[in-house]
Amino acid sequence: MGILQTMFIGFDYGTANCSVAVMRENTPQLLTLENGSALLPSMLCAPTREAVSEWLYRHHDVPTHSDENQALLRRAIAANRDEDIEVLRNSVQFGLASLQQYVEDPEEVYFVKSPKSFLGASGLKPQQVALFEDLVCAMMLHIKLQAESQLPEQIDQAVIGRPINFQGLGGDEANAQAQGILERAAHRAGFRDVVFQFEPVAAGLDFEATLSEEKRVLVVDIGGGTTDCSLLLMGPQWRKRADRQQSLLGHSGCRIGGNDLDIALAFKCLMPLLGMGGETEKGTALPILPWWNAVAINDVPAQSDFYKIGRASCRERV
């Protein structure tokens, strides 16, 4: 029996989309992730929130190293049993398939879009951190399996892009929390070795291949959740250096991205069509907050308040 070879991938775990690439004859090659596309929208769905944790354990033997992950798994199995929910191998869906399933039956499907947006949120309780870790792990595991189905080798090493500042108001603490979630999730998904690279630096490497002399290059990376800028020295003398710290002249990032544009458009253009700005029968202006909570998809408290209203309305109908 031959020895199974292993390899590494470049992994873009994005707020809006995910992609992975491998090196083939010194050239990066994107792998297909969904319906012939190299992009997988950062979405997943399951019958319940708890189904994701049980799916990882029951169908993929994903380990639960921490006490909080183990407690989350026990609660998940008990909750699914109480609701008579059987977690099957295809119970968790990803990308556009998850969106289609959610649209067909929104009241019976647990749907998450852009989980990366929440990783740096302040005030997350340990059980919430454990849940986000499971959500990220499920997506990474799915992507890893999709990639390995196209390769003769197993993948156990990953270079993962990360923004300079994750979304959140906690500064360095938020960045450490978010990267910790990504790193633990990647290890649990089967990546033995995991390293991180600032996304603007990674984006600039492709441009560097076209340079014949050293240049100062400003790289602007506008993503779904963040906008990052880096000023780099680039050129032939830097290409083969593994450590690019000396070439990084400066970097900065803000927690504003494509999701914020989507939120602003939905709030200004869509919410008025759904009643925002209206009045009660007595002529009192309706509060704006419920409509804001509906569109603020990167705000955990706002989304919690919005879905509490939805659940209360469902109970009243029942």
What is the meaning of each model-derived region?
Residues 1-40, 76-219, 233-254, 269-270:
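N-terminal phosphate-binding loop and flanking beta/alpha elements of the actin-like ATPase fold
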Residues 26, 32-81:
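Extended N-terminal export/anchoring regions of large proteins
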Residues 13-17, 225-226, 256-263:
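Conserved A3 ("GATE") glycine/threonine-rich loop of ANL adenylate-forming enzymes
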Residues 56-61, 128-133, 318:
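Short, polar loop/linker segments at the starts of domains and inter-domain junctions
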Residues 41-47, 53, 70-71, 233-317:
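Phosphate-binding glycine-rich/basic clefts of nucleotide- and phosphate-handling proteins
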Residues 18, 28, 51-52, 227:
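Hydrophobic residues embedded in beta-strands of well-ordered beta-sheets
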Residues 55-58, 95, 103, 257, ...:
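Glycine-centered helix-coil hinge/cap
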Residues 222-230:
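A phosphate-binding catalytic loop at a beta-strand-loop-alpha-helix junction
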